Regions:
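Bacterial N-terminal signal peptides that target proteins for export
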Residues: 1-8
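N-terminal signal peptide c-region/cleavage motif recognized by signal peptidases
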Residues: 15-19
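Sec-exported extracytoplasmic/periplasmic mature domains
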Residues: 33, 63-78, 89, 93-97
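N-terminal, post-signal-peptide region of Sec/Tat-exported proteins
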Residues: 44-76
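An anionic, turn-rich surface loop/hairpin at beta-sheet edges
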Residues: 81-82
Length: 124
């Protein structure tokens, strides 16, 4: 599987996945808008700070759905789950809007400003 093919699959997955989860669960949209959750370079959603049990359960559920989607796409494409998850993470961070949280490559949480987010140098 070529890197270009992996990127195309992951981009499609990220675009559908992020939008679908945000529309399905108002609690997710509210937590994202409040800066309580954010996108991570590994393709999974993270809790900013400790969060409460309900928020951690929400994030865990979304991440289970993401892993299932990454696994399905990986099996169909010949890529690894980790490759698809990482590429999706790159795309999901790029798709954040100003005011939303994301994790930088050094592990710190940042709030997206008007400019481009800081992403892993391997992101295309």
């Amino acid at each position: 599987m070529t890197k270009k093919a992996i990127l195309m699959i992951a981009a499609a997955l990220a675009a559908v996945s992020g939008a679908a989860w945000a529309q399905r669960d108002p609690a997710y949209a509210a937590a994202r808008a409040a800066g309580e959750v954010g996108e991570q370079p590994d393709g999974y959603l993270g809790v900013v700070g400790g969060g409460n049990a309900q928020l951690r359960a929400l994030v865990s559920n979304i991440n289970i759905q993401r892993k299932a989607a990454y696994t399905q796409k990986a099996q169909a494409s010949g890529a690894t789950v980790e490759q698809l998850a990482f590429t999706s993470g790159c795309n999901l961070i790029a798709q954040t809007k100003p005011g939303e949280k994301y994790r930088t490559p050094d592990g710190s949480w940042e709030t997206r400003g008007a400019g481009a987010p800081v992403r892993d140098s391997r992101c295309v």
